[in-house]
């Protein structure tokens, strides 16, 4: 960390102190910035990020009343389970503002640059789900649907009118612009598409006759009924697909670099598969809206307190990669009649995915995030697992003892939480014991922390640092001055 970067952090913390933490000595922030700077210089950013994450985890376990005594890293912890490096800040834990301040300091790890190679083993490793739990849950699907008054969707009809503009990326380039190329390269998926939408082969054969494979793209005008993209003189024709770009690829994996050196794997599908999946995607999101415990649309983190029960903030490891596709397929089969579920499975995982390194990988347990319907299907199946645990505990399906957002879940019922852990373990989905928090007073949901019903989430430094650095970059490059000169010149006021 350079001297200039340290100065930026101090500048930012002075402002944050003025707005939120006027009663906290600014020297405490300066001390922490110096410590982090020394760690970066001596050990690098990746080590520093991992170290701060562990400190944060030990700290949150402390305020949960579930202190860590030992961790898999060289880290000083006192007899109370508090990180020794934070000793000067320990008194601040007696107030809500103090806890929030410490979490603010610990969010500095999200500002540090760093990347890691993605781990594909969670994708390729065969499922560890037991046959017994799969049979139990598959048999429970009709009961789950009855408890939540879920009616089958019936037949999902897809026609040419359901084609849409997409701003997403496809395996060959921008999705809509490369739809014509996808149409030829993904022909091996026609049997699967037919199981999901019987008229797809007829429609595509008609389109293939109208649009030659290597001609200028007429997809927007012939299929969508829209005007073709306008091209300025001197620019490359954006509607032309060059022969060298037409690789035999219909599935790719893209890596998104998230904060704290995380590598998130996102699957990229061809335009036609996405278009056919989109109708199921919309129906599943309508279904998710009916679950009072679901937070997809609100991200509302509040959960009613149940006396005598603890909050269980459960951290799932690679949930979507490991949660059995077989169970999700059976759920889809109960929602949609005919061979739709078989086609859905073939479209999602029947074709290998090409990684950025050029390797080919296959999903052997769960399913890829990135396709329409994939996330929503997992979310509904996740609700079903919790409801199965609740059913075993004799609870009503509309009880508000948990909140859920995809793979993020907080359960405020000890019996349900214990059963849930056992079920997920039997399904081959790991729950991190170190990152999971169990407390009568505190819980974490969607990266937000609550203590005695009050939010203590730290101020996220990364967003402010990005704005601050962007502003300084523009100023140093005199970008604003250049733009102002252009504007005044055009207006005749130069």
Predicted stretch roles:
Residues 264, 276-277, 321-324, 419-420, ...:
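Short helix/loop capping segments that flank catalytic or ligand/cofactor-binding pockets
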Residues 2-6, 49, 96-98, 124, ...:
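Acidic, glycine-enriched catalytic cores built around paired aspartates
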Residues 210-211, 216, 221-232, 278, ...:
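Surface-exposed, low-hydrophobicity interaction/linker segments
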Residues 290-293, 431-435, 457-458:
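Acidic/polar loop patches that form or flank catalytic/metal-binding clefts of enzymes
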Residues 258-318, 374, 387:
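Active-site-proximal segment of RNA-dependent polymerases
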Residues 307-405, 410-427, 434-450, 467-494:
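Conserved polymerase palm-domain catalytic core
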Residues 239-261, 342-359:
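Reverse-transcriptase-like RNA-dependent polymerase core
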């Amino acid at each position: 960390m350079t001297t200039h970067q340290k100065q930026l952090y101090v500048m930012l913390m002075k402002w944050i102190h003025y707005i939120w933490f006027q009663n906290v000595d600014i020297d405490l922030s300066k001390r922490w910035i110096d410590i982090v700077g020394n760690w970066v210089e001596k050990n690098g950013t990746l080590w520093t990020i991992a170290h701060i994450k562990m400190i944060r985890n030990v700290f949150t376990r402390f305020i949960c009343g579930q202190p860590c005594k030992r961790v898999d890293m060289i880290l000083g912890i006192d007899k109370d389970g508090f990180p020794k490096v934070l000793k000067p800040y320990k008194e601040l834990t007696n107030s809500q503002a103090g806890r929030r301040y410490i979490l603010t300091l610990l969010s500095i790890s999200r500002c540090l640059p760093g990347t890691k190679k993605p781990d594909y083993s969670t994708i390729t490793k065969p499922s560890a789900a037991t046959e017994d739990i799969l049979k139990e849950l598959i048999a429970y699907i009709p009961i789950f649907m009855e408890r939540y008054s879920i009616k089958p969707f019936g037949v999902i009809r897809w026609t040419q009118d359901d084609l849409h503009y997409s701003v997403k990326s496809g395996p060959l380039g921008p999705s809509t612009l490369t739809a014509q190329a996808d149409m030829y390269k993904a022909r091996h998926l026609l049997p699967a598409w037919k199981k999901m939408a019987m008229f797809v082969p007829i429609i595509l054969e008609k389109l293939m006759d109208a649009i030659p494979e290597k001609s200028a793209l007429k997809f927007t005008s012939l299929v969508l009924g829209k005007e073709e993209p306008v091209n300025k003189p001197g620019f490359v024709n954006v509607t032309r697909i060059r022969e060298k770009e037409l690789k035999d690829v219909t599935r790719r994996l893209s890596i998104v670099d998230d904060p704290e050196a995380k590598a998130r794997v996102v699957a990229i599908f061809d335009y036609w598969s996405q278009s056919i999946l989109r109708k199921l995607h919309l129906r599943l999101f309508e279904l998710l809206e009916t679950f009072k415990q679901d937070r997809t649309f609100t991200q509302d983190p509040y959960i009613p307190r149940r006396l005598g029960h603890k909050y269980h903030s459960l951290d799932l490891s690679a949930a979507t990669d490991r949660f059995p596709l077989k169970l999700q397929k059976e759920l889809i089969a109960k929602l949609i009649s005919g061979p739709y579920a078989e086609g859905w499975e073939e479209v999602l995982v029947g074709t290998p995915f090409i990684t950025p390194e050029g390797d080919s990988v296959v999903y052997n347990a769960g399913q890829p995030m990135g396709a329409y319907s994939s996330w929503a299907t997992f979310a509904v199946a996740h609700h079903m697992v919790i409801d199965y645990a609740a059913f075993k505990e004799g609870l009503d399906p509309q009880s508000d003892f948990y909140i859920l957002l995809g793979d993020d879940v907080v359960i405020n019922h000890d019996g349900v939480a214990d059963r849930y852990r056992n079920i997920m373990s039997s399904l081959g989905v790991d729950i991190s014991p170190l990152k999971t928090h169990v407390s009568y007073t505190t819980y974490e949901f969607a990266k937000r922390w609550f203590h005695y019903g009050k939010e203590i989430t730290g101020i996220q430094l990364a967003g402010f640092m990005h704005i601050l650095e962007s502003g300084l970059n523009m100023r140093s490059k005199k970008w604003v001055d250049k733009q102002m000169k252009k504007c005044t010149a055009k207006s005749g006021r130069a």
